Each structure stands twice: as C-alpha cells, then as structure tokens.
C-alpha cells in the first residue's frame, strides 16, 4: 500500500508542481485528508467496500498518498531558477528537464515525502485492524479488546521498530542524496 501511495502521491505532486490548477484543486483535499482523524477515513471505504483487506488497502493508500504529493510538489516548486534556466539554455527538453534536472535536485525533499508516507501507512495499518485486516495491527486490536498487555505491547513495539528502521533508512538515503546534489 505504501508503494502505491508513494507512486500515486509523487505522480500527483509532479503534476501539481507543473500545473497551478491541479495544485489549487488538490490543496484543499490534501489539507482535509491531513487534518481528518485517521479513523474517519475508514468510514467511506467500509460503506462502499465492506470490511476486509481490500478496504484497509484503499484506506491506507488514501491516507498515505498526501505527504508524498505535498513533498514532491514542494521539492519541485522550490528549485533554484538559475539551474532550471541553465538546463533550458543547453537545450533540455521538458522531459529531460524533469527527469535529469528537477527530480534529482528535488530528491532529498521527495525522500522526506517517502519517509512520511511510510509513517502514515504504518499509522493507518493499526487503525485498519478495525476493518478486519490481519497482521500486527490486528494483534494490537486483539490485545486491546482482550486487555492482553503482552500481545498489545509486543505488536506495538514491533510496529514502532519497523517505523524506526524505515525512518532511519530513508533519512540515510536523503542525506546521501543531499550530498550528491550539493
């Protein structure tokens, strides 16, 4: 779900960075999605698709694509204009400008978006246990419903460790990319 969220979010971010109308349309949607409690996002998916893994997948994608889109758009919109102008002067096409200049320069910011997409996905995974998913989120839910401290804590700590590992890994990638683009 995180991979799909990141691909969807970064694609929309690229589009929004190059089209002010798309950016203006998506901004209130992103603001709403980020301020809405994560549990509330499940409601329309449960109403339309029922309870199950597919519903949880869609809810995770809907919740986690927002940071990927925001960070991608932000990274692409805040590039040094001199570098973009230099690339145009040497004859880069729009496609070359995007893939060979803009995205590599914006990659450290885009990696922050990936980091946040992973964190949002993991957060929604725990909430999605309420709609019948299996895995660590379900174990937390079982631990809560049966007042089983051990099961809940082990599952919660496991998810926290997974989040920390992904966080540190994406931060290391971002730092390497920042060194390359400087």
Where are these regions (language model features)?
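Transmembrane-helix boundary motif in ABC transporter permease subunits
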Residues: 1-30
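Generic hydrophobic transmembrane alpha-helix motif, especially the helices
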Residues: 17, 27-64
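Hydrophobic/aromatic residues within the transmembrane alpha-helices of Major Facilitator Superfamily
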Residues: 36, 48-49, 61-65, 72-76, ...
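Transmembrane alpha-helices
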Residues: 62, 94-128, 150, 154, ...
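Transmembrane alpha-helical segments of polytopic membrane transport and secretion proteins
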Residues: 168-182
């Amino acid at each position: 779900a995180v991979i799909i969220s990141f691909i969807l979010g970064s694609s929309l971010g690229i589009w929004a960075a190059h089209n002010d109308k798309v950016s203006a349309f998506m901004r209130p949607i992103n603001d709403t999605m980020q301020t809405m409690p994560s549990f509330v996002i499940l409601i329309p998916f449960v109403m339309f698709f029922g309870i199950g893994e597919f519903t949880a997948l869609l809810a995770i994608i809907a919740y986690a694509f927002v940071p990927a889109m925001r960070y991608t758009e932000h990274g692409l919109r805040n590039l040094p204009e001199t570098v973009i102008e230099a690339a145009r002067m040497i004859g880069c096409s729009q496609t070359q400008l995007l893939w060979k200049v803009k995205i590599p320069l914006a990659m450290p910011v885009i990696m922050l978006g990936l980091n946040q997409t992973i964190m949002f996905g993991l957060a929604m995974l725990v909430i999605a246990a309420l709609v019948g998913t299996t895995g660590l989120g379900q174990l937390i839910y079982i631990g809560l419903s049966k007042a089983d401290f051990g099961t809940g804590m082990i599952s919660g700590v496991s998810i926290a460790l997974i989040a920390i590992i992904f966080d540190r890994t994406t931060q290391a990638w971002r730092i390497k990319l920042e060194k390359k683009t400087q």
